């Protein structure tokens, strides 16, 4: 396991906030962080992912720089799809008020059956991202790569 994976939390969250073409569904930073900690225990700061690759951080464009950056791109795209669901429309206006229900048992994440359609979709976006992060190495050379030059 790669202890730096917890750092993905902030990058993904900032990426969602900074991308103008991605609607913002329910996003509970603490909840997503706990999901990451369930699968990838770590006590490191999120700052190393604030400017990682082309998608882990504010905005997102171009070709992902590596597997980890593809995880961030996929997560961004998943949230964009959530924004198209009729069930998510009401949630989009109050993105921080609702959280989904999930469980973490022996480092296994499960989105619970009591979620409504939108919460279930978002929970599965986050779950898939965390699983992706857990299998993707952190490449120091993709930190602060200069998105203007490398992410076209």
Curated annotation (Swiss-Prot):
Transmembrane segments: none annotated. It is an enzyme of class 3 (hydrolase). It is found in: Secreted. Binds 1 Ca(2+) ion. Keywords: Calcium, Disulfide bond, Hemostasis impairing toxin, Hydrolase, Lipid degradation, Lipid metabolism, Metal-binding, Platelet aggregation inhibiting toxin, Secreted, Signal, Toxin. Disulfide bonds join 38-104, 54-151, 56-72, 71-132, 78-125, 88-118, 111-123. One of its GO terms (molecular function) is phospholipid binding. Residues 20-27 form a propeptide. Its main location: secreted. It catalyses: a 1,2-diacyl-sn-glycero-3-phosphocholine + H2O = a 1-acyl-sn-glycero-3-phosphocholine + a fatty acid + H(+). Ca(2+) binds at residues 55, 57, 59, 76. The active site is at residues 75, 126. Residues 1-19 form the signal peptide. Expressed by the venom gland. GO terms for biological process: arachidonate secretion; fatty acid biosynthetic process; lipid catabolic process; phospholipid metabolic process; positive regulation of fibroblast proliferation. Its cofactor is Ca(2+). The keyword Transmembrane does not apply. Its EC number is 3.1.1.4. One of its GO terms (cellular component) is extracellular region. CDD domains: PLA2c. The keyword Repeat does not apply. PANTHER family: PHOSPHOLIPASE A2, PHOSPHOLIPASE A2 FAMILY MEMBER. Snake venom phospholipase A2 (PLA2) that inhibits collagen-induced platelet aggregation. PLA2 catalyzes the calcium-dependent hydrolysis of the 2-acyl groups in 3-sn-phosphoglycerides. Belongs to the phospholipase A2 family. Group I subfamily. D49 sub-subfamily. This is Acidic phospholipase A2 S17-58. It comes from Austrelaps superbus (Lowland copperhead snake). The lineage of its organism: Eukaryota, Metazoa, Chordata, Craniata, Vertebrata.
């Amino acid at each position: 396991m790669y202890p730096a994976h917890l750092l993905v939390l902030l990058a993904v969250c900032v990426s969602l906030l900074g991308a103008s073409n991605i609607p913002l569904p329910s996003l509970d930073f603490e909840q997503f962080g706990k999901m990451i900690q369930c699968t990838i225990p770590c006590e490191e700061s999120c700052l190393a992912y604030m400017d990682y690759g082309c998608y882990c951080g504010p905005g997102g464009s171009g070709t992902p720089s590596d597997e980890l950056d593809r995880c961030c791109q996929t997560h961004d795209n998943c949230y964009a799809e959530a924004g198209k669901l009729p069930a998510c429309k009401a949630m989009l206006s109050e993105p921080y008020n609702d959280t989904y229900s999930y469980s973490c048992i022996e480092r296994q994440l499960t989105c619970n059956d009591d979620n409504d359609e939108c919460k279930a979709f978002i929970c599965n976006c986050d779950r898939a991202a965390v699983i992706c992060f857990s299998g993707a190495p952190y490449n120091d050379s993709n930190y602060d790569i200069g998105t203007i030059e490398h992410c076209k």
